[in-house]
Amino acid sequence: MADFFDYLNWRGDLSFEKVPFNKIDALLLAHVTYSIFDGVVPESFSKKKTFAQVARDFTKTADYEERINIGFLINKRTAELMFKCAECERYRNVQLCGFRNIYSEEKTEQFAAVTYLVDGKPVIALRGTDDTITGWKEDFNIAWQDQIPAQKDALLYFKEAAAAFKGSFVLTGHSKGGNLVINTAVKCSKTLQKRIKEIYNFDGPGFSRDFFEQEAYKNVENKIFSFYPAFSVVGMIFHHPKNFEIVKSEGFAFWQHDAMSWQIMGADFINEASFTDESKLFYKAFNEWIDKLDNSQRHNFVDTLFGILEASGAKTNSDIEKEAVKSTAKMIAAYAELDKARRKEMLKILKLFKNVIADDIPIFKPLVLLKNNLRING
């Protein structure tokens, strides 16, 4: 079995001229974008740093130890991967610019982006959901908001990048980043659509059924390349594109979402024949349930679910992991205050998530415990 590090060991000495940019490179850059680049990668599109320069400056930051520990849900070897890129021939001279990092609890907004110049050609990578509860809530807000803040941020970012660079673009993103790149390609002007060469979606949450019927979507559909692990959970939230690859992962259950667990052979992924039964059941059950709700009901569900989570006082998954007992007690108290109808609805959705996430995601651990052990009648 082989991962990103093996890929760089095999292909790291080969330039992009010798081996063109491919799907593995797209996922690798999408994953590296989880790195805490604040104050290291230039915000301007005109000022650029190579991977080698970024790695050097990254190690000099005052909060270096905090930067390499980027939360419970992001692979702890992410910084190591960035350093590996800085050392190898293939990535050493790739330039980074246009860094953005926007976070607002008030607006329920979490967005970050980096533009990589690969042989001078721009690859826009949009960060996925991070460790914050705000980031997760924004994902679920896709259910009822026409455009979540991160989708608006992504479209604006692409317009700025398109004004700064000539020629074609590659858009790539993992998790929520996958949703953002597809949405950006659909919502931008026809002129900008023509400048998009490829769109890479790696296990991103989907869209409503109507989204795929738009003329604007059909204009870029053949440029979209979607990939999901066999045990996909995030990618099964809402409806996904009809064309996709299923990737073999060494991760267990939900942790197959971790891009570093995806298995690589040469410049390609090792594929699986189908999704797991658990993933297929979750996709069917969750989307049949959410499709039956009107917009107001969806909004109410998200606010209720995250109202319980926010009652813990935690800001991140890591916070909940550290204070699991306190968090659980506060969430149970918040749940107990709900009326009977809302409790019943919460138990229904918790059962769906319990079947696919078990104890994997800290923000859901207390809720799963609540589902298993509460002596509150639904």
Segment roles from a protein language model:
Residues 172-177, 181:
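Gly/Ala-rich beta-loop-alpha elbow adjacent to hydrolase catalytic centers
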Residues 181-190:
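Short glycine-enriched nucleophile-adjacent loop
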Residues 1-113, 118-122, 126-141, 145, ...:
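Alpha/beta hydrolase fold serine-hydrolase catalytic domain that processes acyl esters and thioesters
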